[in-house]
Amino acid sequence: IRDQITKTLIWAPIGSIYKSVTWDKAGAMKANEPWSGYYEVWPTIWATAHTTQFATPENWQYLDEACGLFDASTYKGSIVTLKDKNSANWSMIICTEDSETLEVNIKKGLANEKVYVWKSDSENQFVELASIIPKKKSFTIQLDPKSIYSLTTTTGQQKGAYEIPESKAFPFPYKEDYENRKVGDLPKYHSDQKGSFEIALKEDGTHCLKQIAPEAGYDWMRIYRRPNIKPHTLIGDVNWRNFTCSADVFIEGGNVELGGRVKGSFLNGYRFMIAKNGSWKLIHNKKTLSKGIIDGFDGSIWHQLKIKFQDKNVEVFVDNKSVTKANHIVSSGYVSFASSYHHNLFDNLEIIAND
């Protein structure tokens, strides 16, 4: 109202982000279980609908004289009014902080017809109330505190009601060979946290996953400017604790990682990192638990990495040979791939129960 701003962007309209990951509660609604179809409609949807179902960007304009604040010192109660450019229809959107009594006077050029009333509060959203018939181009309405109202001479507003699929855990066990996607597509169910992972062709014509970011971009928030954060992608269930995960890797340059029990966006969890020369580290968060080098490691071919998690015990295998063991802490989290800023490849992800 003060700055006459007429556009709002919601990031993201639908939040499809894994639990525990940064911004997992952003958006107007949540749909982060594509394997089940479950979703949640948050009240933000209906707060938005109080404008979007009562006016359109193309044909409606704000009426400056019919916009204002209940208390200019706090900005906690407001009224905006819009008119259809092609008719006499109008809509008024009201946000209250306290109980209010509002008198509306309808000026020349605006529809003096039945006024439809819709309301939302913390308990119920987008409820149609009794309509109002103006008398002598005027009416009074009592408004409850902490509520949103839309008054309009238009019709057609509605609140959808659908049967939401049941929430289900991420499928377990799980396998992914990346063959069900086109080259250049994003992989199914993966959630990139830095860098970029996409479907690519292998030399034999089959598909794999490739880290394609050649260098770090600009981190627009300081929380991402941590030296241990590198290109990585998550997959699975934040509650996974005891399991075995494996994947094939090809190290084009730098190093790759297979991780498990990883939470959040900052590589917190167990990670096995191996470089093209065969040097490796087992890391938990920022702490190195063990390190070494594999004699005769051939960095020009594919290798299989595997990690077995069982309570406090963590064991790492390279090409089915045990490389290191650790007795550390019990935690839970996702499986992760990570890479230096090279075009490193990943394939044949498998997550299974322990023997």
Language-model features, listed with the residues they occupy:
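Carbohydrate-binding surface patches
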Residues: 65-113
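Aromatic/acidic polysaccharide-binding cleft in carbohydrate-active enzymes
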Residues: 1-75
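Short tryptophan-centered beta-strand motifs in secreted/extracellular beta-sheet-rich domains
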Residues: 178, 245-247, 301-310, 314-316
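Extracellular carbohydrate-recognition regions
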Residues: 159-198, 355
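Secretory/extracellular carbohydrate-interaction modules
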Residues: 204-206, 211-282
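Short, aromatic/His-centered strand-loop micro-motif at the edge of beta-sheets
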Residues: 284-304
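C-terminal beta-strand-rich structural cap/linker in extracellular carbohydrate-active enzymes
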Residues: 132-166
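Short, solvent-exposed beta-strand-to-loop segments that form ligand-recognition rims
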Residues: 317-338
